[in-house]
């Protein structure tokens, strides 16, 4: 694959507003390429290279940090892939996907005017404002990865819809549950936030002003959602606790699902590893 200049790639990824600003960032030592500081703006780098900026917040919202943690933990590479982001809001997940080289992102949210301007004007972003994902039967093209950060709706409802957007996974060896193995060409995947406050029953959600602290409820919610995902054709490949708490201090989790791929069904093992008392 042909390499490209670092300053041009920074602009293309949306990490710098102009080539001049990209060059300034590089000369200031604020750009890392695959973890290493690069001081030449003209350096030839791979289009799939990981680029990191060490100045200010990395993403337009804290959601980007949550998704980054999941991508790192699961070993999922999004470079060159077509993605959809459900519940985009300000665009933290979308921003993270673009910074990691996504070719295109369908940014979907029921609200309007929420998406950060730099994402709203990025040609790689298809803005889908005032759009309720549960009623979107299909997208203009099949996507390889769907990220979900939705509130006031069960993830189970959304999984029933987004599986119709995904490109089917080709046959592949079955990796050990919880290990990496994601990457280009692996087919349809989902990385979704599981929010117990929107999955538990009304009685549980009403306690403590909507903050669920009971590990027993966390376990029940995770087991229920992941078992449902399996029943709908998703293999559960990984599960982590979000590095950041949700609104009001709720514990949240990130699940990695692959569509139409065999699973060895060790949900109980994964759930046990992320429960708060085991952290």
Residue spans of the language-model regions?
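Residues at the N-terminus of the alpha-helix immediately C-terminal to the conserved SAM/SAH-binding loop
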Residues: 89-94, 111
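Flexible, glycine-/basic-rich loop-and-beta segments that form/coincide
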Residues: 251, 256-279
């Amino acid at each position: 694959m042909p390499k490209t200049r670092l300053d041009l790639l920074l602009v293309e990824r949306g990490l710098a507003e102009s080539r001049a600003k990209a060059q300034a960032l590089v000369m200031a030592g604020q750009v890392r390429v695959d973890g290493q500081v690069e001081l030449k703006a003209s350096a030839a780098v791979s289009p799939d290279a990981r680029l990191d900026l060490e100045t200010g917040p990395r993403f337009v919202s804290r959601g980007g940090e949550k998704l980054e943690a999941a991508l790192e933990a699961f070993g999922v590479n999004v470079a060159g892939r077509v993605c959809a982001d459900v519940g985009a809001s300000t665009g933290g997940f979308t921003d993270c996907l673009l910074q990691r080289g996504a070719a295109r992102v369908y940014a979907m949210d029921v609200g309007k005017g929420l998406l950060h301007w730099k994402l709203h004007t990025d040609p790689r972003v298809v803005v889908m404002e005032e759009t309720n994902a549960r009623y979107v039967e299909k997208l203009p093209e099949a996507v390889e990865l769907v990220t979900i950060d939705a509130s006031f709706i069960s993830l189970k409802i959304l999984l029933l819809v987004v599986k119709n957007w995904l490109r089917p996974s080709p046959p592949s060896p079955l990796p050990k549950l919880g290990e990496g193995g994601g990457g280009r060409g692996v087919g349809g995947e989902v990385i979704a936030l599981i929010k117990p406050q929107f999955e538990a029953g009304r009685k549980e959600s009403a306690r403590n002003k909507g903050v669920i602290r009971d590990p027993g409820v966390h376990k029940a919610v995770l087991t229920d959602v992941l078992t449902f995902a399996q029943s709908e054709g998703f293999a559960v490949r990984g599960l982590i606790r979000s590095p950041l708490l949700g609104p009001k201090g709720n514990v949240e989790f990130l699940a990695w699902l692959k569509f139409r791929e065999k699973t060895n069904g060790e949900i109980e093992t994964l759930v046990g590893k992320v429960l708060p008392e085991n952290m």
